[in-house]
Each structure stands twice: as structure tokens, then as C-alpha cells.
């Protein structure tokens, strides 16, 4: 028996231990070495005996026996003949499973080109031979001859000849030359290639050529040739002479009942190949006429093509039922292919699914599991227990007992289940909180019970949702489930670090109702000694829940030693709040409870509890809040009645007033005073404001009521209207929904997003008429269609994000970099959108943080900025901090913990081995379904408000101007003459409070550094035109302003004033094309004036459409406008919002009309114009001038002679991230993408930490283009991983060589995923064929670094608990450049505690895991 076990073990030993997977081309010899015999016949199975035919596709002699340890003819049976080869039927006696691994082969009678290397673009064969694909196909499919060896003739090698040309040539030169057709010809050409010689020639050509396209082509070819040389692949192997045959059990043939067979499509395809191959062999033996042989060869080529990749060339071969057959390539690609269906995720045993219902009495770490399900899921455990306890003698007996459901079985089940966590999962699993572990509680019935507080994480509700259960079987799995996945360990959301276990709906309503106060309630003014007495008073009916009373409250405050000390104060509060206080854990301040608690306040309460007292206290507290909330929501008796929807009286006046206004606009429109567009916009504006007013009146009406207080006076108090309470507490509904119930429904949108101008004036209480109902359905359908599309798109975005970031893991503690990102609060206009605290919380400081205005160091670099640190930063009003970031981390493959900062879901510095890439992808993708799908038409109503014309400050402080050039006009005010001027308001502490952009030509009432008071207007400008400001005083002199040629005169009918309008170049007569209208400012004598400070003439060129109101010779003062350029009011512009915008950003797509940025720093001038474009020239102080052609219709922000900095905006538009990276660097592009993505999420009210977006940006920036290669292994213009270049450069530095220079490249996430170093990961993502073809030709190695590759080869992933395993493997391989496993630092106290724990377990192994993991049940 022992031997048998040993033998079976030896059998199962496979090549487990490998570190790299290499892919390459298979040589014919290699294919033969894999093979166990040649398949000669197309037969499969004998349909009478069901035995495989000899030499056929299922031959037992080649592939192995059909039954375990039994030969085909039945001569040898049983184990004792193991390894014998039967002399009668030739079958080896062994296990059947060899039929899954033994391959066969087919010797092809004529070579066949591999379709992947032929047709997968760019064609590898074509690139290698430097021939167009069309020509190669003509040779392969026997339409032309190709010259292989020209000999002494005039022909060229590789020249194509038609049939006639070939005949002529043969007549002329007889057998001097060699020309063939078909794959043999291509094979011969490939075999004759001298790779090294070709490389040399190409390198020389590369040096000589100047044309960009040619360089690109040569580099491509050179790379391919080098890949062939390095990988040891031979070019002729791209043409096959031997075809491998897949093991038969991987392409099964299954007999169905009724004598029919179900077969894999591959068998049909192989049969076709074998038939044609055999026929070809016979034809060659018979020396058949050329044309027949040729046709047969062509058919063989086509059948092999279909086997490898059906439908890649020509029509796909179809089976009997008209559907294309599934070829080998189809087996591995797509959602149903091998990668995505079987390797990246599989269906598993020990799982079940059922509907979920509420379990309001459960504790947070529990879930209810129906007994029937538990019995089924825990079967093996029950069998084992029954046997070990001696209730059953054999497994079979145990099985019977379980099937009979004996009474003892249920007792055993309860025992087995105790402390055995199970995993619950709700599809779609959008983030890691979609699978959590719970302890099962056995329940009757068939539905599982779920704790209400985890619903938010699962995004579950109880309207029929189903959930799946999985059982972790091994001890390790149970331990992981309990220590990492238990719902009690997932209190915080990984996306933003806020609690995700927060009460919602009923619970919120109950707590809110409890903590409200009521004027003159029963028992008001009582004095009570403690909360217990308050509860007694409430229970006995002496006081109401909402009565205002005085109660002695005892709080526990930590002293210097960290012990809790009681402090008692007499507090004004309400009965309900005192009752709630009884469940508060020690150490929480009463002030947090002494207020009306809505959803936000309760969330804050739990967050505070987590930060002050840790996980255990928070979890218990959350549970208690839930029980209390449910109880008091029931007591409150809130309900919704039709009378609760109170319609304001004012509504009808407001509506009739609006109708009158609309009628007036209509009259103006009919008399031609306003255009159709203006009328539409105004009407919509009127109704929008009317709606707002109705809503305001309604809310005022609903939210307050007047009551008589104890003194007998009237007092206002918050209303106890049920609908209002639900919305106000945050339990359900919103002001917008109440508005539709009791106000007016308002304007509706059409499916394309435009607004219908007739609003719905009715609300739901009054009811809608048919027309109104119809208009409503219009927009509602769009909403449903949107949702369906959105889900798919969001899922695809998540998939791309996960794919690009999957291999990013924390691999070391500190990379030692001093780089970082400077964080400043995000201020738009007068509001602080995001505070500094939110931005830096949980990050690590990149340099010492100084107290503002001093040299005092508040915190040294590498401090983790937690809540306490942030409080101190706020107190000292620090307004910018340089923090470390993933984008600037120096770790080669992975990130270091210090650059990442805090693990948001745990609240401490992140652990090594944490898969931050996947977490980031999930955090960004999960809220994707909440984002809208729509593109917003911002026009009319919205943009009217956007045209600002002044800056009015909201805070007092002092002004700071940045990027400003200005002149002082004769009133002593500053006139701005620079483009992107920014005005910030700084408070007394030096903190930025407000931030505005000030346009060119604005007049400033205050200068830099001056004090302003709140409400003061500091800048004014005309929003509709852009002035051309004179920077000197003098007299106007027109240049090239010729009436009728370059300008036209227009006289205003109302005022009688005439003005000059400059014509566009395109509209001018030919004579005026080269004239450049300008205004010069000269002194009284007519001499030129130079602008002070710069040696530039005071001459202003006028663009087309500019309006000049001054006359020639008029006097101008400094800062006066010489001309005005009307700003075209941009019509309705589509602003892409929501999900598509996020996708565009991560894909780094170029916008339709991108902003034009200055490529270099210098002075702007305009060169000669061409048709439709003007030439922009930037001349730097030294070096070459830069020229760019810009379309005429682009509005430029610069004038001739203006100085621009590299990266300045020359023409407005959406900025291209690639340009930002090129001109302003990595920091700028990171900031741009992070802010733009956050903008979308903020609009939807979704909080995501910047870190996650930075992680994705890091992955988008991981490639670079080599600009100077020197003598390294890289080619110039090659795309390489930045980490690779860094490693090479460190080596070169040590050798004293100059470092390789490269330019960072920004790739979109799809491109970045496909450009990953791991071909396995890329192939399982998209474009499988292309990725594998490329990898095979280059002989790529996959180091199995990422998570995906390891999942595919069936290993632990190099993250989380598998991280140490992988580190050890690497260590054992003895590689020198390994990140050393850092030892976990324990303090002595920790060690003592751990030791005590372990001793306890050693003495009493049955001691509960729960105690060990702090899950003890003393929380009751």
C-alpha cells in the first residue's frame, strides 16, 4: 500500500517549480518531440464498438488508453501490468488522464504558413521579408511565382512573376534561376535570410536616413530582426512542416443518447486537414498535373488556417448548422475563452445561493444561514465529526445519517458551524467589500439573513436580492476569512477612509426622532440625576422623549496616564439624547450626542468612535445604534399621509407671475426684439426661478411650525411633519423629491438632454393631466435606458483600470526619495472646495513642515500626517504641504509604503504586500455606476450666469497677484495686460481664502498686497469684448488700415457713432491680403514710442473682427483701450460629463479642439499666413525659433510681441494631457488628471481619495521613449519601462558612463495594459492573438510579477498573505537585487502579549479563535 501511495505521488509530480514562462516559435523537431505518434487517418471512433480507430484522431496507441490501466483489446487489465505495452493493440497500460496531455502530430506533405504570423497586423513574415502582405498572399495562395535564386539572370531576388512572365523567363534562361510558388517559396526565402547581415545594413541605413517615416519603418524591422536573433527563434519556423495535434480529451467526442455524437469543432477542423494532406500525398506520389497539386496545396493551406484561426482569412468554415467552427484561437480569446472563463475565475465547490432578508437582531459579525443550506455546505465536516465521535462506522453510514436527517446530525451541525466563518458575496462584486466573512447562525426557513449595516458595502437591499455563500475549507482560509475579511474588520471604506458601516433609513429616522427637541413638551424643565432616571421618567409617562430637561451626565475623559476618569456635569439636554447616551462607549464626549442627529452626524459619531477607541468599540457601538434606532423608529410612528404634503399658498401667484413674464417675452420675440434662441433661454430661466421660489415657499411652510411655549408666547420650532423629518434626517428622500410632491414638478428634459420649455406646474398631490404625464414619461424612459448602458460601460472601465494597475503592490517600506507633490487647498472663486486637511490626511510629509513665517520645524519629513497632526497644521494655519506620492515613488517594480501613506481601510501606515493597484481600480470603478452617462449641453440659461464681469471678495484680507503685468491708468488704477493673471485673497495667517482668474484688460481697484474688506469689488471688466490696451500715452497712428481694403466703416443707427471694423484675411480683396492692420502709438512729433521695460515698439496688430472707435491721430492715455475684440459668445457647448469624461481622462484621449500651448519660452510673432492657417512663431532669447501653423478660426490669447513661457496657453480649449506632460512635466499632468477626475466625482457627491487616481496615473506613466541611447541595449525611439531604464542607468553610473536619456510617455489605460511587460497579463486582457503573436516572435519571458499572471498559472498571488511566500521564493533563488523582507517590528509589550496568547492556545487548543482575534462575545 505504501508503495502505491508513493507511486501515485510520483505520478502527480509535475513541473511545479518554475520562475519564468517563455513563449516562442516551435521548431518542427520540437513538435515531433512532444508527439507520441503520427495521426494518419481522419477517422475518430468506430461507431459500432465506440472504440477509437487506430492511427486516427483518437487513437489509443498514440494518446493512451480509454479506460484506466486497461489496454484496448482487453489483454492486459489491472494495476499489476502497469507500464506494459500490449503487443496486440500497441496501447500502453496506464491512467486515462494521459489522454489530456499526450500530443500527436501530422507530417504535412507541403509546408504551410502560420496564419498568425502572416495576417496578424503588422504581418511578421511581411516585415521580415520586407514585402507587402498582398504579394506574400499571392505567392502563398498560388497566384504568382516568386524568385528565390536569380542566378545569372536580370531577375531580382524576391521579385514576383505571373504565370506568363515565368514561362517567358524559363524560355530565356532555362534553369539558370529558381522561382517557386506556395509556402515552400516563402520558407526558402526565410531560410536564406542572414539576420546579422540584415541588421548591419539596417543600422547603416538608419544612420543615413533623415525621413521620419523611413526611420520608423527601419526601427520596426530592426527590432523584429534583433528579437529573432536574441530569442533563438528561426524565421523559417513561421512556416510549418509539422502540425501538432491537441490531446483528444481536450477536444472530446461524446456519444449522446440516440446514437448521435457531440463533438468539439476542432475534430472537424483536424479531419479536414488530414483528408487534404492525405490526398495531397497521393497526388504527389502519382505525379499529378501541376494545377491539381497546386489546388490541393492551396486547400491544405486554407484548412490549416481555419484550424488555427478560423475566419481570419476569407470566409470562416462553417459546420453543418451554418455557424462558424470554433478554432484554436477562438478557444483562448474573448470572454468565453480559456483566459477569462477558466483561468482568471472559476466556479467553485462548497457554495450556495439564496434570497436575503433582514436580520435586525444579528450582531455585526453574524449572518443567518438556513439549516438546509448549512447541512449541504458542511457535509464533509459533518461526516468527519460523525465518524470521529463514533456515531457512524464508515463514511457511507455517515452519509445515510445525514440523508435521513437524524436528530444527532443537527447537533453535530451546530458544533461544526461554531466559529467557522463563511463568505457572503453579492454580485456584482464591484469592490473588495462585496465579499465579506460572517459567522453563521442557524435559522429556519430558506432565506439567508443579513445584518442591515453591511448593506451599504454590499449595495444590497431586501427587495429580492440574492447572495452567494462560500465555505473556506482549510484552516488557513478560515484564518484569513476571520482576520481579514470579517465584516467587523471592514468598518472603513478603502475608497475614502470614512466608515462604511453607517446606519441608514429606519435607523437614522429613529435616532433623529429620539434626539429632536419639542417646545413645551410634557415634563419640560425637570431636573434628573442621571440618564437611567430620564429613561424611567419616559417609560412611566412623566416626560416625553423630546422634553428639554437638565440631567447630570457623567463623561469619561482620558488622563495623562491614558486611564479613563469620570467627570460629571449638569447639562441642558433632552430625555431622548440622555437615553441614547446610555449606549455610548466610554471615552466619547457628550457634546457629540447633544444635538439633533441626522445621517451625517451619526456617521461622524461612528468615525470619532473609531479614531478614539478603535475597531471593537465602534463595532459594538454601531450595533447598539442600530438596535436603538429600529426600536425608536417604531415608537415614533412616522408615516406618510397625503395631508403631510402641504402645498404653499404662494404657489399660484408665483406661477401666474411667471406666465405673464413668458407672455411678455413671446411678444418681444414676435416683434423681433429677441432671437428665438434668446427667447428659449429666457423662458427656461423664468421657469427655473419660479420653480426655485415655489420650492422655497414650500420648504419654509413644511419645515417650521409655530407653537406656544411655557411662558405662553409664540415660538418657532422645527416641524414634526413625517415627510420633512425623513428628508431632514437623511433617512429617505430629498428636498427635490418633496418639491415634486408638494411644489411643482418643474422643467423636464428630452431624451437628448435639452429642456422642454413648458414646465409641469402641477405636483403629484394635485395630480398630472395627460399632457403633463406624457412629458414626464419622455424623460423617465431616457433614465432607464441610460442606467442599462451605464452599468456595462462602468464595468468595462473598472476592468480596464484593474488591468492596468493589477501588478502594483507595496514591496518595500521606504524608497528614500525626497520628491513629492505640493498640496494646497482647492479654492474656486470665493469657496474652499477641498480643504488642505482632506488632501494631506493619511499622507507622509516629503520635507520638514515649518511653522508659517518662522524656521521652526513643526513635523520632520517622513511623518505620517494623521488626525492629530492635521489639527496642529490647522491651528498653525499651514497652507501648503509637500507630501510623498505614488507618482514620485522610486521603487522599481511596485511602490513603497511611505510614498503611499495610510491604508485607508485600516487607518495606519499601509502594510507591505497590500495590492494598492487593485484597491485603487476598485475605488474608482465602484462608484462608476452612480455617475451620469450624459453629456451636458451648457448653453443659454447656464452660460448666462457664467459670464462674470467683476471680482467681489467674500473675506477680508490682503490681495496677492500672480503672473501679472499691468499699467497704471490716469485714474491711478491698474489695468491688467497679461494673460493668465490670478488674484488670491490671503488672510492674516497667510492662508489662501479665495482664488480668481482675472482676464486681460481688467481694471483693478486695489494693487498687490493691499488690504480689502469683505464684499468689496476689486476688479471689473467687460465680459463681452476683449480690449487692446495701450501701454503708453501718445497719439494714435493707423498702419495698413485702409477703408474698403482691410477695414469697413459701420455707423450705429441709434447713436450715430461710426466705428472701424477690421476684416478677416479671408474676406479681403487680393490687394489687402498681405496688409497687416495695426495701431501705433506715437509721440506728438510722430516718432515711435517704445514700451518701457522691454524694447518693443508700441504697435498693436489688430485681428479680424476687431472694432476701433478712435480716429487716426486721437490722443490716448496709458491703460486706455485702443480697440475692442468681440468675444464670440460660445453657443451651446457639449461638456462631456460623468462616466465618459472619466474614461476619456484615463484613456488620455486628445480632445477635439485642444488648447494650443507654447512649446518654448520666447517672444510671439506671426509669420506669413497660408490659406486657412496662420503661422505662429516663438523666438527664444537664444536658440532656434519655433513655428506652428494654427487654424484661423482659433481665438488666440496672445498678441504680437508678447512674451510667453513654455506651457502657456496660446489658444483656449481643453488641454491635452500629453502636451501638459511634455511641456510642464509629470507633476502638472498628475495634478491635471487628478483634479479633472475628482471634478466629475465631486459633482455626484462621491468621495474618493486622490491617492487612488495617482496610482492609476503612475501606471499610465510607466513607459518612456528613449531619446539618447549611447551604447546601451536600447534603441532610440524605443518604448521602454521607465523602471528598466533606471536600473540600467544605475549600472551605467557605477561604471562612470553617461545615463540613457528618455522622455516620459503618457499612455491611456488600455494601451498601458497591453504594453505591460507580462505577455500573459496582456493576452488575458484584450487582443489576445496580437499579443501572443508579438510575444512568440520576440521569445518573450514572463517573470510572473503581477497578480494576474500568478492567478493564471495557479499560484498564490504576490500580494497579501502570498507576499511573503513569493519573497521567500525569490530569496531562495538567491537573486542579489531582492527587496529584503522587512521584519515586523514588535515592541516588547506586544511580544509578551502575543506569547501569552500563544501559550494559552497551546495549553487549550480548543480555545476559541474568536478570543484570539478580539471577537469575544462580551459585547452583549
UniProtKB/Swiss-Prot annotation:
> Which annotated residues bind Mg(2+)?
461, 463, 465
Top EC class of this enzyme: transferase
| CDD domains in the cross-refs | RNAP_beta'_C, RNAP_beta'_N
Q: Which GO terms describe its molecular function?
A: DNA binding; DNA-directed RNA polymerase activity; magnesium ion binding; zinc ion binding
Query: Which keywords fit this entry according to its UniProt record?
Result: DNA-directed RNA polymerase, Magnesium, Metal-binding, Nucleotidyltransferase, Transcription, Transferase, Zinc
Entry GO terms, CC: DNA-directed RNA polymerase complex
Chain positions recorded as Zn(2+) 1 binding sites? 71, 73, 86, 89
Q: One Pfam match, by short name?
A: RNA_pol_Rpb1_2
Q: Name one GO biological process term.
A: DNA-templated transcription
Query: What does the record's cofactor remark say about binding?
Result: Binds 1 Mg(2+) ion per subunit.
What are its cofactors? Mg(2+); Zn(2+)
UniProt EC number? 2.7.7.6
Give the catalytic activity: RNA(n) + a ribonucleoside 5'-triphosphate = RNA(n+1) + diphosphate
Report the sequence similarity comment from the record.
Answer: Belongs to the RNA polymerase beta' chain family.
* UniProt subunit comment: The RNAP catalytic core consists of 2 alpha, 1 beta, 1 beta' and 1 omega subunit. When a sigma factor is associated with the core the holoenzyme is formed, which can initiate transcription.
Task: Identify this protein by name.
Answer: DNA-directed RNA polymerase subunit beta'
UniProt source species: Mannheimia succiniciproducens (strain KCTC 0769BP / MBEL55E)
Question: Gene name?
Answer: rpoC
Amino acid at each position: 500500500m505504501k508503495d502505491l501511495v508513493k507511486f501515485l505521488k510520483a505520478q502527480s509530480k509535475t513541473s511545479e517549480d518554475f520562475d519564468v514562462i517563455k513563449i516562442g516559435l516551435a521548431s518542427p523537431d520540437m513538435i515531433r518531440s512532444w508527439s507520441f505518434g503520427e495521426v494518419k487517418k481522419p477517422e475518430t471512433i468506430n461507431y459500432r464498438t465506440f472504440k477509437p480507430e487506430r492511427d486516427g484522431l483518437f487513437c489509443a496507441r498514440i494518446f493512451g488508453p480509454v479506460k484506466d490501466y486497461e489496454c484496448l483489446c482487453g489483454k492486459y487489465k489491472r494495476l499489476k501490468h502497469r507500464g506494459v505495452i500490449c503487443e496486440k493493440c500497441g496501447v500502453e497500460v496506464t491512467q486515462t488522464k494521459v489522454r489530456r496531455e499526450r500530443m500527436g502530430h501530422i507530417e504535412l506533405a507541403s509546408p504551410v504558413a502560420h496564419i498568425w504570423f502572416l495576417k496578424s497586423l503588422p504581418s511578421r513574415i511581411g516585415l521580415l521579408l520586407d514585402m507587402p502582405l498582398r504579394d506574400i498572399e499571392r505567392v502563398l495562395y498560388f497566384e504568382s511565382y516568386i524568385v528565390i535564386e536569380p542566378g545569372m539572370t536580370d531577375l531580382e531576388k524576391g521579385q514576383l512573376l505571373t504565370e506568363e512572365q515565368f514561362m517567358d523567363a524559363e524560355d530565356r534562361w532555362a534553369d539558370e534561376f529558381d522561382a517557386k510558388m506556395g509556402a515552400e517559396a516563402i520558407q526558402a526565402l526565410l531560410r536564406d535570410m542572414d539576420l546579422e547581415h540584415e541588421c548591419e545594413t539596417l543600422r547603416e541605413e538608419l544612420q543615413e536616413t533623415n525621413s521620419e517615416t523611413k526611420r520608423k519603418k527601419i526601427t520596426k524591422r530592426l527590432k523584429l530582426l534583433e528579437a529573432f536573433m536574441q530569442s533563438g527563434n528561426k524565421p523559417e519556423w513561421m512556416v510549418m512542416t509539422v502540425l501538432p495535434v491537441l490531446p483528444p480529451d481536450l477536444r472530446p467526442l461524446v456519444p449522446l443518447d440516440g446514437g448521435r455524437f457531440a463533438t468539439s469543432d476542432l475534430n472537424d477542423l483536424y479531419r479536414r486537414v488530414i483528408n487534404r494532406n492525405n490526398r495531397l500525398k497521393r497526388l504527389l506520389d502519382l505525379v499529378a498535373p501541376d494545377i491539381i497539386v497546386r489546388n490541393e496545396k492551396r486547400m491544405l493551406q486554407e484548412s490549416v488556417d481555419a484550424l488555427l484561426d478560423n475566419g481570419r482569412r476569407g470566409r470562416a468554415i462553417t459546420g453543418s448548422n451554418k455557424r462558424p467552427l470554433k478554432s484554436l484561437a477562438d478557444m483562448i480569446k474573448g470572454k468565453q475563452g480559456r483566459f477569462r472563463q477558466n483561468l482568471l475565475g472559476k466556479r467553485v465547490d462548497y457554495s450556495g445561493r439564496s434570497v436575503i432578508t433582514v436580520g435586525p437582531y444579528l450582531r455585526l459579525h453574524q449572518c443567518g444561514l438556513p439549516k438546509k443550506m448549512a447541512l449541504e455546505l458542511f457535509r464533509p465536516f459533518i461526516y468527519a465529526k460523525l465518524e470521529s465521535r463514533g456515531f457512524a462506522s464508515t463514511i457511507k453510514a455517515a452519509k445515510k445519517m445525514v440523508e435521513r436527517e437524524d436528530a444527532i446530525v443537527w447537533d453535530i451541525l451546530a458544533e461544526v458551524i461554531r466559529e467557522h466563518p463563511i463568505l457572503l458575496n453579492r454580485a456584482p462584486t464591484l469592490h473588495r467589500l462585496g465579499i465579506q466573512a460572517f459567522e453563521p447562525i442557524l435559522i429556519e426557513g430558506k432565506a439567508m439573513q443579513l445584518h442591515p449595516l453591511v448593506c451599504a458595502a454590499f449595495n444590497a437591499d431586501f427587495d429580492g436580492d440574492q447572495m452567494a455563500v462560500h465555505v473556506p475549507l482549510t484552516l488557513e482560509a478560515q484564518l484569513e476569512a476571520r482576520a481579514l475579511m470579517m465584516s467587523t474588520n471592514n468598518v472603513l471604506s478603502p475608497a475614502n477612509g470614512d466608515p462604511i458601516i453607517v446606519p441608514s433609513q429606519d435607523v437614522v429616522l429613529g435616532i433623529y426622532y429620539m434626539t429632536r427637541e419639542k417646545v413645551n413638551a410634557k415634563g419640560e424643565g425637570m431636573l434628573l440625576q442621571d440618564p437611567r432616571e430620564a429613561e424611567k421618567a419616559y417609560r412611566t409617562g412623566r416626560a416625553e422623549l423630546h422634553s428639554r430637561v437638565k440631567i447630570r451626565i457623567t463623561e469619561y475623559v482620558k488622563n495623562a496616564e491614558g486611564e479613563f476618569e469620570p467627570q460629571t456635569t449638569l447639562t441642558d439636554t433632552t430625555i431622548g439624547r440622555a437615553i441614547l447616551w446610555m449606549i455610548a462607549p466610554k471615552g466619547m464626549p457628550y457634546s457629540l450626542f447633544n444635538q439633533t442627529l441626522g445621517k451625517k452626524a451619526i456617521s461622524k459619531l461612528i468615525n470619532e468612535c473609531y479614531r478614539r477607541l478603535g475597531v471593537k468599540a465602534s463595532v459594538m457601538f454601531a450595533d447598539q445604534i442600530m438596535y436603538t434606532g429600529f426600536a425608536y423608529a417604531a415608537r415614533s410612528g412616522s408615516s406618510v399621509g397625503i395631508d403631510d404634503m402641504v402645498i404653499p399658498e404662494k404657489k399660484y401667484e408665483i406661477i401666474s407671475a411667471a406666465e405673464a413674464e413668458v407672455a411678455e417675452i413671446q411678444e418681444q420675440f414676435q416683434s423681433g426684439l429677441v432671437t428665438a434662441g434668446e427667447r428659449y433661454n429666457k423662458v427656461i430661466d423664468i421657469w427655473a426661478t419660479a420653480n426655485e421660489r415655489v420650492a422655497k415657499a414650500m420648504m419654509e411652510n413644511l419645515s417650521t411650525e409655530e407653537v406656544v411655549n411655557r411662558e405662553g408666547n409664540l415660538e418657532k420650532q422645527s416641524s414634526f411633519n413625517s415627510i420633512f423629518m425623513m428628508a431632514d434626517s437623511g433617512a429617505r428622500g430629498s428636498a427635490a423629491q418633496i418639491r415634486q410632491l408638494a411644489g411643482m414638478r418643474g422643467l423636464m428634459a428630452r431624451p437628448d438632454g435639452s429642456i422642454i420649455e413648458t414646465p409641469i406646474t402641477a405636483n403629484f398631490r394635485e395630480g398630472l393631466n395627460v399632457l403633463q404625464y406624457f412629458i414626464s414619461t419622455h424623460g423617465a424612459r431616457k433614465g432607464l435606458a441610460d442606467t442599462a448602458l451605464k452599468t456595462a460601460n462602468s464595468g468595462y472601465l473598472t476592468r480596464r483600470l484593474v488591468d492596468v494597475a493589477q501588478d502594483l503592490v507595496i514591496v518595500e517600506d521606504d524608497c528614500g526619495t525626497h520628491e513629492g507633490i505640493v498640496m494646497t487647498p482647492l479654492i474656486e472663486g470665493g469657496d474652499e472646495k477641498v480643504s488642505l486637511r482632506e488632501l494631506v490626511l493619511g499622507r507622509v510629509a516629503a520635507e520638514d513642515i515649518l511653522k508659517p513665517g518662522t524656521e521652526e520645524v513643526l513635523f520632520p519629513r517622513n511623518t505620517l500626517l494623521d488626525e492629530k497632526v492635521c489639527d496642529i497644521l490647522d491651528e498653525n494655519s499651514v497652507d501648503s504641504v509637500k507630501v510623498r506620492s505614488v507618482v514620485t515613488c522610486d521603487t522599481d517594480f511596485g511602490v513603497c509604503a511611505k510614498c503611499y501613506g495610510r491604508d485607508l481601510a485600516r487607518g495606519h501606515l499601509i502594510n507591505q504586500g497590500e495590492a494598492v493597484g487593485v484597491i485603487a481600480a476598485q475605488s474608482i470603478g465602484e462608484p462608476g455606476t452612480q455617475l451620469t452617462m450624459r453629456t451636458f449641453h451648457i448653453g443659454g440659461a447656464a452660460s448666462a450666469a457664467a459670464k462674470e464681469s467683476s471680482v467681489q471678495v467674500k473675506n477680508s484680507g490682503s490681495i496677492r497677484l500672480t503672473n501679472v503685468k499691468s499699467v497704471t491708468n490716469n485714474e491711478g488704477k491698474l489695468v491688467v495686460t497679461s494673460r493668465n493673471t490670478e488674484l488670491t485673497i490671503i488672510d492674516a495667517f497667510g492662508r489662501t481664502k479665495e482664488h480668481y482668474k482675472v482676464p486681460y484688460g481688467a481694471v483693478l481697484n486695489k494693487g498687490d498686497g493691499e488690504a480689502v474688506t469683505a464684499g468689496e469689488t476689486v476688479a471689473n471688466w467687460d465680459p463681452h469684448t476683449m480690449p487692446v490696451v495701450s501701454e503708453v500715452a501718445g497719439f494714435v497712428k493707423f498702419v495698413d488700415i485702409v477703408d474698403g481694403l482691410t477695414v469697413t466703416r459701420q455707423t450705429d443707427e441709434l447713436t450715430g457713432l461710426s466705428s472701424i471694423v477690421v476684416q478677416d484675411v479671408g474676406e479681403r480683396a487680393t490687394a489687402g491680403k498681405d496688409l497687416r492692420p495695426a495701431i501705433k502709438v506715437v509721440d506728438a512729433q510722430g516718432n515711435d514710442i517704445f514700451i518701457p521695460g522691454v524694447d518693443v515698439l508700441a504697435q498693436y496688430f489688430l485681428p479680424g473682427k476687431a472694432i476701433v472707435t478712435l480716429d487716426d491721430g486721437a490722443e490716448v492715455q496709458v491703460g486706455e483701450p485702443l480697440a475692442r475684440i468681440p468675444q464670440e459668445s460660445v453657443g451651446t457647448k457639449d461638456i462631456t460629463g460623468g462616466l465618459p469624461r472619466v474614461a476619456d481622462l484615463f484613456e488620455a484621449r486628445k480632445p477635439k479642439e485642444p488648447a494650443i500651448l507654447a512649446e518654448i519660452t520666447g517672444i510671439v510673432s506671426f509669420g506669413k499666413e497660408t490659406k486657412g492657417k496662420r503661422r505662429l512663431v516663438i523666438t527664444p532669447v537664444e536658440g532656434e525659433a519655433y513655428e506652428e501653423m494654427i487654424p484661423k478660426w482659433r481665438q488666440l490669447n496672445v498678441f504680437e510681441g508678447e512674451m510667453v513661457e513654455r506651457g502657456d496657453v496660446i489658444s483656449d480649449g481643453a488641454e491635452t494631457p500629453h502636451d501638459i506632460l511634455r511641456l510642464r512635466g509629470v507633476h502638472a499632468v498628475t495634478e491635471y488628471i487628478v483634479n479633472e477626475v475628482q471634478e466629475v466625482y465631486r459633482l455626484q457627491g462621491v468621495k474618493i481619495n486622490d491617492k487612488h487616481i495617482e496610482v492609476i496615473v503612475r501606471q499610465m506613466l510607466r513607459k518612456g521613449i528613449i531619446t539618447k541611447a549611447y551604447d546601451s541595449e536600447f534603441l532610440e525611439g524605443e518604448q521602454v519601462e521607465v523602471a528598466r531604464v533606471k536600473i540600467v542607468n544605475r549600472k551605467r553610473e557605477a561604471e562612470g558612463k553617461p545615463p540613457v536619456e528618455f522622455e516620459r510617455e503618457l499612455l491611456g489605460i488600455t494601451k498601458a495594459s497591453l504594453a505591460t511587460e507580462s505577455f500573459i497579463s496582456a493576452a488575458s486582457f484584450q487582443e489576445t492573438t496580437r499579443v501572443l503573436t508579438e510575444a512568440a516572435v520576440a521569445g518573450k519571458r514572463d517573470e510572473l510579477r503581477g497578480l494576474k499572471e500568478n492567478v493564471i498559472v495557479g499560484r498564490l498571488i504576490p500580494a497579501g498573505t502570498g507576499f511573503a511566500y513569493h519573497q521567500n521564493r525569490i530569496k531562495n533563488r538567491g537573486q542579489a537585487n531582492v527587496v529584503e523582507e522587512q521584519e515586523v517590528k514588535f515592541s516588547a509589550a506586544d511580544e509578551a502579549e502575543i506569547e501569552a496568547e500563544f501559550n494559552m492556545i497551546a495549553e487549550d487548543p480548543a480555545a476559541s479563535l474568536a478570543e484570539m482575534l478580539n471577537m469575544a462575545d462580551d459585547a452583549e
